[in-house]
Amino acid sequence: MRGFRIVIAGHGTLPAALLATTELICGEIPDLAAVGLSASESPDHYAEGLRATIGRDHRPVLVLCDLLGGTPFNVASAIGRRSPRVVCIAGANLAMAVEAALADGDLDDALVERLIEVGRAGIVETERHRARRVS
């Protein structure tokens, strides 16, 4: 059983689409939420929504952010600096979201490293990937 909640944070409708696609692959995922930053939304307003979604129930929260240095990541990181139960990873992709959704256990350093590895491993250029598999 997963001992943490997951929030997907990012620009526009990407977080909602990533959530929907994760659930398409995995089935309904408890404690999975998405918070997208709209083009007209201020960083302060976005921060209010993200804080409300993260909540205050003292359970650990993994925030998967779309872009390092973007407003969603900056806001999530600021929240994480004030709350050690919040862990942020930038550069989130579908492989990472699926791996996190299916994870058992706690949100610890080993899981964070595994999620980053899974995310990186899924980024390949097909011809080079095929050539490596053939040789």
Q: Model-flagged regions — what are they?
A:
Residues 1-135:
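N-terminal loops that bind phosphate or other acidic moieties
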